[in-house]
Amino acid sequence: MIRIICGGKKNAGAYSEIIAEYEKRLRKPYDIHWEFYEEEKLLKKLEKWPFDEASEYVICCDERGKNISSDEYSSILTGVFENGRDVVILIGGAYGFDKSVREKADFVWSFSRLVFPHQLFRTMVVEQIYRAQEISRGGKYHHE
C-alpha cells in the first residue's frame, strides 16, 4: 500500500477527477490511501516521526531531492514492496519540509527544481505511481 500524506486541502475540482481515474487503475500493492493535514499539524506530526522503519519506506517530495526517471522510480517501489514494506509519500504544504524531515526520509524525490501547485503535483505523483505499476508489470502504458 502507498500512503500519501499531504499538507493542505483535500483534492478538489478537475484534478480530483483525474486522480480518481488513476486510482481506479491501481492494484495492490500500488493502492493509495490519502491523509490530509493542515500544514502546522502535519509539521507537528512529522516532528515525532510516526513511521516504522521496518515496515515503511518514506519518500519526501522536495525540489532539493534527487531527480530520477520513471523506470528508476518503478524500481524503487518494486524493491520496497518485494521487501514487504509499505510506501509513505510526503507532500508538503506551501513551505515544503525542513531539513530534519528530508534527512529522516529514506528518499528525497524531486520532480524538478520548479515548484508546482499542490493539486497539480498530487496528480503528477499519482500518475507516476500508475506508471511505475505498469512498468513493473510490463504494461503498455509506458513507452521508451
What are these regions (language model features)?
Residues 1-22, 26:
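N-terminal beta1-alpha1 ligand-phosphate binding loop
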Residues 5-7, 61, 90:
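Short hydrophobic segments within beta-strands
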Residues 10, 63-66, 93-96:
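Short glycine-rich anion-binding loops that position phosphate/pyrophosphate groups of nucleotides
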Residues 15-19, 70-74, 102, 122:
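Conserved strand-to-helix beginnings and helix N-cap segments that scaffold or border functional pockets
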Residues 17-24, 47-50, 101:
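Short, aromatic/basic amphipathic alpha-helical patches
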Residues 27-88:
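S-adenosyl-L-methionine/SAH cofactor-binding core of RNA-modifying enzymes
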Residues 72-99, 107-116:
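Catalytic beta-strand/loop module used to bind and position nucleotide/cofactor moieties
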Residues 99-143:
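Structured adenosyl-cofactor binding patch, chiefly the S-adenosyl-L-methionine
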